[in-house]
Amino acid sequence: MNVTQQSEKEAVIKLTGISKSFDGKEVISNFDLDVNHGEFLTILGPSGCGKTTVLRMIAGFETADAGTILLDSTDVTSVPAEQRHVNTVFQSYALFPHMTVFENVAFGLRMQKVAESEIEPRVTEALQMVRLAQMANRKPHQLSGGQQQRIAIARAVVNKPKVLLLDESLSALDYKLRKQMQIELKQLQRQLGITFIFVTHDQEEALSMSDRIIVMRDGVIEQDGTPREIYEEPKNLFVARFIGEINVFAATVQERLDEKRIKAEIEDTSAIVYCDLDVAPGDKVKVLLRPEDLRLEEIKESDNKGITGYVRERTYKGMTLDSVLELDSGMRVMISEFFNEDDPDVDHSLGQKVAITWVESWEVVLADEQEV
C-alpha cells in the first residue's frame, strides 16, 4: 500500500468518548466519530441536537468535558484553536469590512508571519480557485452574498488546513444561489482534496454534497452512512422522518413466506413485503414508503380491492404531481408522481377513489417503535 492509499484510509479527525455539558445539561454524551482524509462529511440534525457543538470542539472553540480529539493522530484535545490545522467558515462569513478582498484572504497568512513574497501568489491562487481574482481590490460590501461566501472559503483554504469546517455556511443564501454553491463547494473540495466537515439542518444540502452523513439527535448519532443509505435504508423512524417525506404504515405480521419476505396486514389488506427482521405471526412492524415509491390507480366507487382511499389534495410542481390521500382508517398518505401530460389519468380529481400499489422490495420495514 502506498502512502496516499494509506492516508486516505486513516482518520484525519478522531473523536473518542467526547462529552460536553452547558449549565449542568449534557448536550453531547460519550460521542465517537472518525472522519477520513479527503472526505466530505455532513453532520445533520435538528436545532439543538449538538451538531454545532461537535464542530466547535473540533475547531477548538469549545473544550470537551471528557474524551479525546485527535488530528492526524496527534492529541489536540487541549490545544487552542489558533494552533490547530483546522479552519472554519461561519454562517456570517465574518469578513473584515474595512479590508479589501485580497487583504481579507491574506490576513491569516500575515498572522502566521508568512513572507510577503509568498503571500501574493498564494492569495491569488486561492481567489482563482473560487473564480474571484478580479474582485481582489473590492471591499466586502461591494460583493453579493454568494461572492462573500466564496471569499470566506478562499480565506479559509489559503492556509492549507487539514480540515475545513463549515457551520450552516449556505443558510443565508437564497434558494437558487444556495443550489449553485452546493455544486461549487463539492467541486472545490474535490479540487483541494482536503477534508470538509459541513454542519446543516437542511436534508437536501446533505444529500446532494456529502460522501457520508451522520444524523444526530440529542447529542447522539442515530445513523452513519452514505446519502443513499440514509435516504433508502433509514435505521429508525426518526431518521426516516427527518430525511425527506415518508409514509409510515402500521402492520401486523401474518406469516413468513421465505427468508426475505413476509405477509403482513396493512390497512385491513394482506400485502407481501420484504423484511429481514426476526419476526413471528402477530408481531407489529412499521412499513415505510417514500411518496415517489407509491403508485396510484383510479378505481370505481364499488371497488374495494387492496389499499384504497380518496384524493383530498393535489399540488402541481412542474415535474411532479403531489397528491394527499385519505384512507378509510383516516390515515393520510403522500404520493408524488412524475407528471405526464399525455396520461389522461395522471391529473386526479379531488374526491377520486384510488388504489395504492408499490414495487415489491421498495419498502423499508422497521421494528415497531413509539412515534417521536
From Swiss-Prot:
Its EC number is 7.6.2.11. One of its GO terms (cellular component) is ATP-binding cassette (ABC) transporter complex. It is found in: Cell inner membrane. ATP binds at G45, P46, S47, G48, C49, G50, K51, T52. Keywords: ATP-binding, Cell inner membrane, Cell membrane, Membrane, Nucleotide-binding, Translocase, Transport. It is a peripheral membrane protein. InterPro entries: AAA+_ATPase, ABC_SmlMolc_Importer, ABC_transporter-like_ATP-bd, ABC_transporter-like_CS, Mo/tungstate-bd_C_term_dom, P-loop_NTPase, PotA-like, PotA_ATP-bd. The keyword tRNA-binding does not apply. Its main location: membrane. GO terms for molecular function: ABC-type putrescine transporter activity; ATP binding; ATP hydrolysis activity. SMART domains: AAA (SM00382). It catalyses: ATP + H2O + polyamine-[polyamine-binding protein]Side 1 = ADP + phosphate + polyamineSide 2 + [polyamine-binding protein]Side 1. Residues 13-243 form the ABC transporter domain. PANTHER family: SPERMIDINE/PUTRESCINE IMPORT ATP-BINDING PROTEIN POTA, SPERMIDINE_PUTRESCINE IMPORT ATP-BINDING PROTEIN POTA. Belongs to the ABC transporter superfamily. Spermidine/putrescine importer (TC 3.A.1.11.1) family. Part of the ABC transporter complex PotABCD involved in spermidine/putrescine import. Responsible for energy coupling to the transport system. The complex is composed of two ATP-binding proteins (PotA), two transmembrane proteins (PotB and PotC) and a solute-binding protein (PotD). This is Spermidine/putrescine import ATP-binding protein PotA. It comes from Aliivibrio fischeri (strain ATCC 700601 / ES114). The gene is potA.
